[in-house]
């Protein structure tokens, strides 16, 4: 059976999304496995230097992918690279919503999202902290083949790191963390490692919140009161979860041999090691959704947009990983008779 194409979203049209989409197509155009279409105003992709062909039927994308970028057209305001405006907010969200619909309806194998500028969207009334939460809302009425999310995971440099908390001030993290949050997030990561990454018996390492994982309570109680009790419950469920590990030694090469993924307690704790090890090739994944979603692990880069300076490494990695996850998920659901 012919593989379904992937679908890319526009992201902010004033950012580097259009440029890296063109560069990703140039790198992948001869590999039909990674065929995609982008949902965008056609003129924006053309302005980034892309050879485009408008399609209405997503299934046509693989047939024309080698010769042109398949574009599913939507309306949009005129846009200048490097000059974002909230007037484009509707185009940005429409691209995301249509991509989600096409993936939920089985037309696309997965969605790959280009970077958005949340502050620009907020000016137009956008009410979600980011892509992760927005996608969770758009798909909330559909079943996932494992525990529902959404959970943010970063992949790169041989690491897979999920986050217990995402976009919040550091001072709020300790107040937000609780046993239930860790249990839910860990269960989703465990399910994703099995379903989306094909790891039969995944090992999950839990990072401590405090320096030296609290040093037996001398530097904080969260490990004793929250993280370790959660780990004990997870182990009773058959999930191979460690007690809280000191985050300063958790990511070196020898430590990485002892786990398949890390559950970090806050945003920078998880993202710094991934971006340090693989700054250009990291991928953002949303776990626990009924659809497969990946994204490049960088922002809109308005300062270099339209200057042919942007690297497409992360988007290319996101496209390849989206295809791999979609294939793994299909295999898992078929083998285990799971409906998604």
Q: Where are the predicted features?
A:
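Detector for methionine-enriched segments
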Residues: 1, 152-153, 168, 265
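A broadly tuned "polar low-complexity/structure-edge" signature
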Residues: 133-140, 164
């Amino acid at each position: 059976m012919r593989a379904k194409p992937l679908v890319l979203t526009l992201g902010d049209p004033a950012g580097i999304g259009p440029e890296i989409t063109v560069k990703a197509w140039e790198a992948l155009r001869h590999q039909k496995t990674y065929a995609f279409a982008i949902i965008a105003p056609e003129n924006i992709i053309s302005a980034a230097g892309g050879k485009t062909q408008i399609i209405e039927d997503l299934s046509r994308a693989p047939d024309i992918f080698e010769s042109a970028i398949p574009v599913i057209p939507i309306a949009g305001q005129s846009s200048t690279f490097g000059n974002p405006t909230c007037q484009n907010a509707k185009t940005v969200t429409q691209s995301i919503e249509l991509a989600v619909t096409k993936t939920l309806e089985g037309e696309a194998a997965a969605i790959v999202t280009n970077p958005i500028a949340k502050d620009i969207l907020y000016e137009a009334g956008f009410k979600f902290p980011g892509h992760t939460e927005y996608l969770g809302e758009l798909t909330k009425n559909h079943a996932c083949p494992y525990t529902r999310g959404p959970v943010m995971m970063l992949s790169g440099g041989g690491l897979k790191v999920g986050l217990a908390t995402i976009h919040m001030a550091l001072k709020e993290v300790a107040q937000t963390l609780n046993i239930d949050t860790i249990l839910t997030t860990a269960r989703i990561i465990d399910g994703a490692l099995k379903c989306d990454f094909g790891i039969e018996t995944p090992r999950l390492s839990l990072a401590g919140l405090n320096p030296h994982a609290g040093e037996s309570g001398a530097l904080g109680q969260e490990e004793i009161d929250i993280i370790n009790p959660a780990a004990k419950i997870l182990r009773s469920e058959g999930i191979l979860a460690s007690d809280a590990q000191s985050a300063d030694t958790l990511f070196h090469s020898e430590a990485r041999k002892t786990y398949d993924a890390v559950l970090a307690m806050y945003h920078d704790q998880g993202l710094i090691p991934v971006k340090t090890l693989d700054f250009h090739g990291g991928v953002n994944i949303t776990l626990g959704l009924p659809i497969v979603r990946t994204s490049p692990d960088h922002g809109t880069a308005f300062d270099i947009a339209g200057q042919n300076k942007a690297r497409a490494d992360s988007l290319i990695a996101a496209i390849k990983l989206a295809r791999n996850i979609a294939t793994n998920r299909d295999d898992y659901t078929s083998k285990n008779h799971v409906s998604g």
